[in-house]
UniProtKB/Swiss-Prot annotation:
HAMAP family assigned to the protein according to its UniProt record, in alphabetical order: Lipoyl_synth (MF_00206)
Gene Ontology terms for molecular function: 4 iron, 4 sulfur cluster binding; lipoate synthase activity; metal ion binding
Record-given protein name: Lipoyl synthase
Catalysed reactions, semicolon-separated: [[Fe-S] cluster scaffold protein carrying a second [4Fe-4S](2+) cluster] + N(6)-octanoyl-L-lysyl-[protein] + 2 oxidized [2Fe-2S]-[ferredoxin] + 2 S-adenosyl-L-methionine + 4 H(+) = [[Fe-S] cluster scaffold protein] + N(6)-[(R)-dihydrolipoyl]-L-lysyl-[protein] + 4 Fe(3+) + 2 hydrogen sulfide + 2 5'-deoxyadenosine + 2 L-methionine + 2 reduced [2Fe-2S]-[ferredoxin]
Protein encoded by which gene: lipA
Signal peptide from the UniProt entry: none
Protein's organism: Chelativorans sp. (strain BNC1)
Keywords: 4Fe-4S, Cytoplasm, Iron, Iron-sulfur, Metal-binding, S-adenosyl-L-methionine, Transferase
Binding locations of [4Fe-4S] cluster 1: 59, 64, 70, 298
Family: Belongs to the radical SAM superfamily. Lipoyl synthase family.
């Protein structure tokens, strides 16, 4: 099927690859998912810093429901390597297409923004860049090094793509020594073909495992969305897969459908069900688990890092006395 797009009289569509898909019903959100519109002074100041430094945030691009809360506290997740992704995941609101060249000034601009915002902890993520030989690994490393030079006290968390078929890319990123390496599985393996078709579930598991093999001191983290049609037992098996890769921290949040062209929400998981997942995650051995309707990978990342570090120290102390 060929989709003809008019880009002369109309601007380029955000998701051209989804234009031919039938509209999906967008379900009304339950009361426990409602959030206030962002209008605070802190939010506006953060937005101005982002704009002045010509930066992209996943908060805006992915339509995160927590943007008002996070930006009010001067927390933001910077999205490097542009705003155009080479993948076309069925759940994601980030634009798909052919990205432009990397901005050589971006590492310095990100570091400047981190300093201006006075961040104790920063999260750096990116679009997928399958067009680059290293998937953008060296650019990740450059950003980490620029932040270290500008604000040595800032702890750094990265949320990376999978670097599929990019030999040596992971090693480049790990060598830059981020404090937290996050790579999201996004969903259970049975949903990959329809939800995350460009990725491979067990490649992502192996990626996380390799981080620990290369540098055991780096915290590892992964997140999923629920409400995509997965079964409960599949979520529990996914937890086991992550623990087999020695992943420290799991996040579980509700999938929210960005547009009628995206994958539909199959279920709004209740707060009680989320709490149950969190309890089970701790029994399976995760150092930390965050599970709630509005949980996102970077939500409360700074506070969570302190708790994560304390949990590791407590576990090590317990092991010494045993």
């Amino acid at each position: 099927m060929v989709t003809v797009l008019d880009t002369v009289s109309k601007p380029r569509p955000r998701h051209p690859e989804k234009a031919h898909r039938p509209d999906q019903e967008v379900l009304r959100k339950p009361d426990w998912i409602r959030v206030k519109a962002p209008t605070s002074r802190g939010y506006l100041e953060t937005r101005e810093i982002v704009k002045t430094n010509k930066l992209v945030t996943v908060c805006e691009e992915a339509g995160c429901p927590n943007i008002g809360e996070c930006w009010d506290k001067k927390h933001a997740t910077f999205m490097i390597m542009g705003e155009i992704c080479t993948r076309a995941c069925a759940f994601c609101n980030v634009a798909t297409g052919i990205p432009g060249p990397l901005d050589p000034n971006e590492p310095a601009n990100v570091a400047k923004a981190v300093r201006e915002m006075g961040l104790n902890h920063v999260v750096i993520t990116s679009v997928d860049r399958d067009d680059l030989n290293d998937g953008g690994a060296q650019h990740f490393a450059d950003v980490i090094q620029a932040i270290r030079a500008a604000t040595p006290q800032t702890t750094i968390e990265i949320l990376t793509p999978d670097f599929l078929r990019k030999d040596g890319a992971l090693e480049l990123v790990v060598a830059a020594k981020p404090d937290v390496f996050n790579h999201n599985l996004e969903t259970v393996p049975s949903k990959y073909l329809t939800v995350r078709p460009g990725a491979r579930y067990f490649h992502s598991i192996r990626l996380l495992q390799r981080v620990k093999e290369i540098d055991p001191s780096i915290f590892t983290k992964s997140g999923i969305m629920v409400g995509l049609g997965e079964e409960r037992n599949e979520v529990l098996q996914l937890m086991d897969d992550l623990r087999s890769a020695d992943v420290d921290f799991i996040t579980i949040g509700q999938y929210l459908q960005p547009t009628k062209k995206h994958h539909p929400v199959k279920k709004f998981v209740t707060p009680e069900e989320f709490k149950s997942y969190e309890t089970i995650a701790y029994t399976k051995g995760f150092l930390m688990a965050s599970s709630s309707p509005l949980t996102r990978s970077s939500h409360h990342a700074g506070e969570d890092f302190e708790r994560l570090r304390a949990a590791r120290e407590a576990r090590l102390s317990l092991a010494k006395t045993a």
